């Protein structure tokens, strides 16, 4: 099913302690709380798939995929107290974050 008329926000997290199950579980729990932001239409919490091709970067720890109806909803998410609390509680867990935002072509 093709997604149309959406704003995609895809975040990749690299944990400081990549082998620490407690840190991983804490990040995932934080993302589950974050999923309650009302402007989020869909979300997915993932880990690297067991695929290996030259073009794949599977070095991240956790991915966070969300969709919004529009940029205004995503902007609202950025300043939502739930999002700010997530950053406050979980930012010490990661060493690197990369965000890819996209809209319809």
Regions found by a protein language model. Name each.
Residues 71-92:
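C-terminal structural segments of small proteins and small subunits
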Residues 1-61, 65, 69-76, 103-105:
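Short S/T/G/P-rich N-terminal loop/turn motif that feeds into the first structured element of a domain
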């Amino acid at each position: 099913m093709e997604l149309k008329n959406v704003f995609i926000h895809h975040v990749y997290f690299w944990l400081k302690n990549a082998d620490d199950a407690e840190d991983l579980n804490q990040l995932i729990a934080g993302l589950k709380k974050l999923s309650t932001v009302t402007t989020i239409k869909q979300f997915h919490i993932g880990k690297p798939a067991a695929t290996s091709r030259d073009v794949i970067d599977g070095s991240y720890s956790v991915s966070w995929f969300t969709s919004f109806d529009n940029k205004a909803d995503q902007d609202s998410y950025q300043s939502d107290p739930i999002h700010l609390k997530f950053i406050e509680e979980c930012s010490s867990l990661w060493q690197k974050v990369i965000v890819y935002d996209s809209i319809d072509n």
